[in-house]
Amino acid sequence: MIGLRQNSNGASGVVWVHTRGLNQMDQVVLDYVRWVMVRKRDPDAPAPDAVVPDLAPAVPPEALIVPEGLDFTGYDFELAGEPHRWGDYALGEIIDHVDGVTIEEAEHMLATRLWQNTAKVHFDATFRDDGRRLIYGGHVISMARALSFNGLANAQMIVALNGGAHANPCFCLLYTSDAADER
């Protein structure tokens, strides 16, 4: 843990975690910082001194790794379905990703488990005052990336994420019926 700050509501806070993954030769193969909002165990406990890590605004280009031997000389733009390349985009351009998707409870919970997020608020509808499961932000960001394929079909790999946010909560709707059985 490299940072901690209480939110203005006093009931939760943000925890920054630095994760490094090493292979069998002790070489770094994964290195990232993420932040998570968590509830305080005791909402009445005084706020700890805030420690907000100083993070780089972007991954420096020299840290971006393209796999050795990657070769796109035979790449077929017609088969990919879009002709657009790097030079076809302009700073500030808006791309309309026309596809949409409904976020499903089962997919959200599976993805949340795969990311090893065990926060009860994502699984137990009784854990929130409004009785709704909160959709895990990593799932929302993953869905956004998947939908971005339409408009960025020739983007072959993600070499870094410089940041990401979903500014508002996302929920699945629970449908119920009051219809009586009239057999």
Show the residue positions of the predicted features.
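Short aromatic-glycine-enriched beta-strand elements
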Residues: 10-18
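Non-catalytic linker/capping segments at the edges of enzyme domains
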Residues: 39-131
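Extended, compositionally biased flexible segments
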Residues: 126-142, 153-161, 166
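Short, basic/aromatic beta-hairpin or loop at an interaction surface
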Residues: 67-73, 146-158
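Conserved small/polar residues in nucleotide/adenosyl-binding loops
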Residues: 175-182
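Short, surface-exposed secondary-structure boundary micro-motifs
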Residues: 2-4, 34, 100
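Active-site beta-strand->loop segment that positions catalytic residues and contacts the acyl thioester
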Residues: 1-10, 22, 162-174
